[in-house]
Amino acid sequence: MKRILITRPRAQAEAFAETLRLAGFEPVFFPVIEIQPIESNVALERAVSKLGCYDWVVFTSVNAVDIVFENYASAFLQEVPALKFAAIGPKTAEALQARGIAPDFVPDEYIAESILPGLGDLRGKWVLLPRAEIARKALPEAIFEAGGIPHEIAVYKTLPAQLDLEGLAALQSGVDVITLTSSSTVHNLVIVAKRNGLDPLSLPGDPLFVCIGPITEQAAREEGLVNLVTAKEYTTQGMIEVIRKMEVS
C-alpha cells in the first residue's frame, strides 16, 4: 500500500486522509504549517463596519472564510446593497455557502488571477481582500491595474507547525508520495527536512511530489525539488486523481 504524506494542517487534512484511505492508500500526517488568526484585528473590524463601501469581497481560501465568519458572520449576512462575493476554488465557495452566502462568481481556474474577468468593470470600485499575512500580490495588483481599489486585510498567519515525530519518522523511512497544497507547505517542508538531517532534494524512497496547482509547483521548483506532478484540477480530489493515475502507470 502506497504511503502518502500530507503536509497541510492536521485540522484540514482529515477529509483528505479519509478519501485517500477509501482510494486504497495509507495517509501519513506530517503537518508542516499551522494557521493562526490575527487577534484584535482592528483593520478587519473597521472594514466590516463599512461593508457598504465595498463592491466586492473576494475570498481566496477556506481559512479566510472561517476566520472572518467566526467573528463577523452577522455583518456579512445582513443585506448590503450592491455588495457581491467571489470565491477562489470550490472548497472556498462551499465554505461560503455553508455560512449562508452564495458566491456571485467562482472562476473555473482556481488561482487568484483568474478571478479578475468575473468581477466586471472595476473602475473606481472597492474590493475587500481578506487573506493571509504573507500572500501573493498578483491579485491586488491586477485589480489596481483594472482601475479598482484593492483593500488587503491580513486575517491570519501561516506559521511553522510543531514537529510531528511520527510524520518525521515516516519521511525518514521513506514514503511514496508527498502532497504539497501551498507554497508555505513547500518552504516549510524543505526547512524541516534540512533541520532533521534530510536532503529535501534526495529524500528516502525518492517520493513523488504532487502539487495542488501551478503556484505551488513554481514554489517547489524554486526550492529545487524534482519528480513533480501537478493536479489538473487544483483541489485535493484532483491530487488524488493524479496519484491514482501514477499508480496505474
Please tell me what each predicted stretch does.
Residues 1-249:
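Signature of uroporphyrinogen-III synthase
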